[in-house]
């Protein structure tokens, strides 16, 4: 509920007088309660939004209908009933769930009660006498629709049920009793009709003509024919306010029967009695009233006239809404009188020196803090009392009598021997400077309200204290802003803390030597921090533990339902349980804390507990604010919280209600403070909902629901989910034995209580899961797997902190729970520590323990998982973890998820996000004769072995260790099954794995071999387990070396008879775990025989459906394949490794890549791919800006939780978005965007591709065709003309910077970003490598390490230029005959180019599309080269030095397969038909077909067509010179498979990026799905002239790129910026028009091609008769191959001699053909 106004009675008049005032002058109606009774009033218009309805009632009925209205039978209604003698209100708006209010005040007592109903939009308040409550409905609409009249006491019979929204109201019993003064706002409503009403309505006794009340008295109809007069505000008395002055303000039915003017109720009272008879009063006198607001009081100085009395009397009247407060006090030490209001009751304490006499007076119903006047009289008189003792004689004692309102009286006797009240101090009225320090005071706060006519009288004199204060007597001292009239004092509204995160910050509490705090609280929750404040840790340094450097603190907390006080004044703390019973019972609990120096007391519900602080300090020095209800989020980390305050460390804020907070006797307006601070989760009022919150089963995904205070609490531990209702999937981290996550806390943490929970899954029996570590001590709390059990270790380094020897424990405490937890299933572990108590739970099986010693403080700087990196104080390092961890929550902090989302900046990790297959440290045994020898296996009493293997061989020895006598152990592969053979001295035994099929299937399999101390052997293959019990010998005594993978040949013959292996293992081994030790098989080997190498890439050499994951594109090569991962956000050989990942923290961060001024590219096409995860609904991910002044830009952003792109390349802003994919869910998403001119596509994950085609493309295509015919010398003129005409606004000009993170745009991104790729640039990878062009700023963290460079000198250029690869696996070569060029060696610089045709020069010499450039200049810093034809050995002419400008990043790389080309850019299929229709189309195994395929971008003997246009000018391809009009005659056909031929120009993709995995569609490699009819599937060729790829088109299905990925997801098309499907390819249409003018050229080209084929056939003949030589193809590194193999050429031992030209690279001989 929002903080809103609470109903209070109107000012000036107390409720009783208000009742009388409202009833006066208005007719009363008597309802008989008979059938058919009703009253109908005019419609209450104020009920629609804001308004008040009030009336008075008197009844003895327990159930009846009072009021009803509705909207005519639709949704809204308001109903006021009597239920069980109490008022119940129900209402609703807009068909929302009805709200219900049930008041506690009984009204069926046949007495008058005042009712006020207040409407305020969705909120309605109901008040009866002094009780008020409010409720609110959760409706869409704020206003209530009111269509009916106001029905009172019943429903007329003519109202149909269908016209009633709440039809049951018609069957409620009619009201029986009196109802008077019904008002809507300030006016009575018009009575439209009635039935069954009697008496009062017909006799207007209080009408002006008959009003009997004189002097302005208020007339009230009490009963038929009977009236009463309220004279309280007139100054007169009597039945009709006509007799002199009345002594006090009060209702007409009060009796004056005291000789000193004390007033007593003879009947009734507000909320308790009816209107009784008015007795004849004595002569009135002037009243002396004062208002106290908590900080005011006055005192009379008795030092000059001390009191010595034996008989005395105190009288006063009070009116308040406050439950606690000091009204009067005199005396000190052991001689005093104290009169207070405590919990709404009057409390009297008298001590005459021998002990205190206490009396408590409570009303029968309600409380005295009802804002009505109450009169108190205290007397002490001498009485004779029969004593009981030795003498059994009568003694004189003093009788003490206290009466409140004349009828509530308590009597008692003071202690004997002390009869005189002596006081020479002060007479305090309404409060004191320090109420908590007054002797005998049951309260610690001053009075708030009105006090009137305070008089003290004894035998000798009379002190009219109120009069003396008003008249300014010199002996009277006034404190504060006293007002000598009765004013309304706002009640201290309670507040509700609705969540553990809610808190209110109070001003700093200055309580150095003395102080007091009192409050009431109410909750049902067992734990919570109520109050907390602390001082500065004076002189504290790192690692300081001296007691002199302790910080002072004060706290109150609830633990397990008990209230605890915690106090430390710098010399030692105390922790005191203040309540003897649990106080979380949902009832109000009053707490009163008082301190004076080291001494003090805390009282809980009047049960006081004294305390004495330890040490010598008496000063409590608090520097921080005083926090109520909890701590701020930042304060939990930044403040060095005292470890003794357990709820602070556990982040357990208080949930419940708090009221009446007084600090040092002064009130604190909690509601006002909460409103001023905008406190989240702090609501006004306090109500306890009776409905069970868990009844609706709100917890999802198996979460356990428990009831809280007006809330439910979901326990998500063990579910794999987090969040309020377990709705958010917890982050999973995968560990391979070398990975970790480390939380490096900003400050050293000291705790005495911890709650830790996590889930794990592992196949290893050993491994560290979580540990706290300290840089300065051996303190640790560690969870690890130990022999398949969960082991908890808690070590508290007592010696390190200098604690007393008696406090030291016996050493680390350990607990074990669970068994066989290494079953590759999810398990849940939880640790709960409270001081010395330990609790370890695994899968709901709990083990408890108790720590020895008094020292309980745990110090830590780090929380580590996977690997324990802080090892200075540990003797035995736990084994590294291999497996998966999830849902790590440490003291309320979900660190894994916070680390992933960037919520914390002190996280370091290289573990991989997501549930990934784990293969740790794989090694490959290349031959059966290869093996390793390690140190002896230690397996004497027990053993736990684990490893993974992958092979195609059916047999082989995996592990062998011999021992003393006949002891040995063997693990081997026999006919595809695992055998475990062992001998412990009882003879050899064999166990065979029961896998359902042979395991030599080239898949990874997991093997677990264990033996427990009970001699139970276990063999587990994947998920299938075999066990065997052995008798006899229990120990395995091994010696000698442990052999892995095989043995020497002469040793096989000596193996025991049950061992079948006669050869070694050939395949891969990984994740080898030897009893908790993870050896590095190669580094730790004592001997390594044969070919044993790191890594395991498998034997596959052909692109298959599973070759590349995450939509990576398989690129077939001569002896293998590589995966192009550029548009996946992943890396690695098969696109399954995380791309370079950065986590952007809360404060925002920015990564900026800036092109050098001379190398700024201008592009007509752009490719962007990025992976990310976030919970933000609005942020900017990536932005690319052009140079200053141009205004071109491209921006990828998140808006309302969805991804969108906006770009501008010179025209208007163009937007494209994906509204269906919500990406703000914290999961990993991959976005792919492509742009070609104004066309754009956007794809999120596997959602369908969104495409956008701005109008006007057709004109642009035609102009592009025409542009190619213009000679170079006129090209600039035409470009300027086109620019003037607005035709060339499709180019992203002069790109200057790429900015990642959105910090500069005011919409910073928070989360992780992986594998970003933009036009050949991998900016995140460059940032990780500290590239000089990259700048980082803000809260940024690199996950793991940056990508390593695995490229040789020969393959660096090849891999970096994988972006230029076409990605289909069918390829032919088109040979150009119009240009002669000569190549240079692949130096990653610009190639030298010479053109002989102006037409071609115009299109090819200047590839830049930047129309702002004045001339075409060669670039000296470019990293890409132009592929050329090596045709002659002549040096290039001087003109060749003017090579085209080539921007460093490629701006042309196709998105996956066909996505890089539009219809504008592609040659029609007819242009490719001659190449694809030759004799080598169907079968490509023949060498004659393979020989000509020598296409590359690196001048290594490849043939290219120089007539192709610049890279980013896609329009040029429409005039490809080999095009014929046969395109339109082709019928769709399936492309011929060529599995062993790689794609042109691509030798590999940079498979070294790291990024989290994400599911992706699974499509067959090499198969294309064409979206549009006759659409060619051709990638953009490399920069400069290249070789187009011929591929047969298919009509029916939509275009699908040839991608490979993991299965299980829909096969959806990827982005492809092509024209709309209903339009024919414009390029083909335009080319047909040109064909008649190029017939001669085509004939020449065909003739030249035939000549080339003859020459090549001859060359192949020579090639096949060469000396073959011998060579071995290493299949373990297919992603790094030499360029000759990459281009389909056959590797020769001896290349034919050729002229030495710059185009020759080492080990890569060029084969040159001359045409």
Swiss-Prot record:
Keywords of this entry: Calcium, Cell adhesion, Cell membrane, Cell projection, Disulfide bond, EGF-like domain, Glycoprotein, Heparan sulfate, Membrane, Metal-binding, Proteoglycan, Repeat, Signal, Synapse, Transmembrane, Transmembrane helix
Free-text tissue specificity from the UniProt record: Brain (neuronal synapse).
InterPro entries recorded: ConA-like_dom_sf (IPR013320), EGF-like_dom (IPR000742), Laminin_G (IPR001791), Neurexin-like (IPR003585), Neurexin-related_CASP (IPR050372)
SUPFAM superfamilies given in the database record: Concanavalin A-like lectins/glucanases
Topological type in the membrane: Single-pass type I membrane protein
Transmembrane segments: 1640-1660
List of residues binding Ca(2+) 2: 779, 796, 857
Region: Disordered, residue numbers: 1461-1511, 1529-1549, 1583-1626, 1682-1715
GO cellular component: cell projection; glutamatergic synapse; presynaptic membrane; protein-containing complex
A family per Pfam: Laminin_G_2
Similarity comment text for this entry: Belongs to the neurexin family.
Protein's UniProt name: Neurexin-2
